[in-house]
């Protein structure tokens, strides 16, 4: 790997006991999968399984989940095999809640986001009597408990606080309601909690319990990128879509490489890096509809936290390349701050990071939800949707610095375009930006 490679930093990471770096065969294996050299990829995956481990160092753990995803990528084009491998898998609400809790506890990213979001709400709603927060993924009570405690001390008394929490998991909303109403009762705080059981893309903004006079704040933490998921076939003309169906019917007459190549071509059509495609116009109808619906609420504040990576429209090999860079930093920060024997760490890596990696590599079209984009792309998208940026609080930045230092000196943040980027060893991982209705 030359010094210009995005992987030069991996040389500093620990190798396994045999001195082998599993990153190298993984990258080669990914190229084989993308080109359709399945037998070679199979040999590579066999070798990788011998030098990687979900219980090893950070690189070994990450490579384990990337190699697993590559394996699923291969078998997904054999529908019967793929369904058989996944037929017994059950997603429990309790597991989802638990792994989010691990992410909150072991890494500072969610705490950072919540701190900055709450400070922005406090400052923008300073004189409002009725504050209505719409949480697009209501799952962590600590954020709003902290806000309730702070607003209770507001000079002149607290506002009437409404929180409309959106989550497709009923259990998550029930837990949120219990914790928030309990805290409000203890503090004698005026609170109304409105649970909305819904997928993000199905939220009916017109029927949300927003009343005239409500000062609206919207909080979106790692949610909006899922709305970038689109049907790749729909981007092509209807004639092309029909032709693809005819070609699919003759799969036996085509090579596996050709079949994979179709995925890569479709992905390129949607690429925000492509000169053939505007940044997002037409690429994601769901995103455009959703942003327009939010704008109609005329929010006084909209705070967005997103992954700082570019994994939306690129082809398979570029996607893997960029995902290795992003997730390499996440696994490294866990390796540096959490013991290898931690059960919580193992579950976080397997149930959250591993599943995200699998979605990025294995899935295409509407099934690929992990379509991260960089801050500059979100800025352009939000501006075009009719929002203007709100500078983030100085007080919030001071508190955020103290928060990050409690985890590790390698955590830091930097300012960019009136937004904040939280970093690990100078590598931006998440962005936080604040907006308002124009």
Swiss-Prot record:
Region (SAW): 362-436
Region (Leucine repeat I (LRI)): 20-81
Short motif VHIID, span: 131-135
Family annotation (InterPro entries): TF_GRAS
Localization terms from the record: Nucleus
Residue interval(s) of motif LXXLL motif: 224-228
Pfam families found in the cross-reference section: GRAS
One GO cellular component term noted in the UniProt record for this chain: nucleus
Region entry Leucine repeat II (LRII), spans: 175-207
Keywords: Nucleus, Transcription, Transcription regulation
Main localization (coarse): nucleus
Disulfide bonds: none
Region (VHIID): 100-165
Ranges where the GRAS domain occurs: 13-436
GO BP annotations, alphabetical order: regulation of DNA-templated transcription; response to symbiotic fungus
Subunit architecture: Interacts with RAM1.
Family that this chain belongs to: Belongs to the GRAS family.
Protein name: GRAS family protein TF80
Species of the source: Medicago truncatula (Barrel medic)
Gene this chain is encoded by: TF80
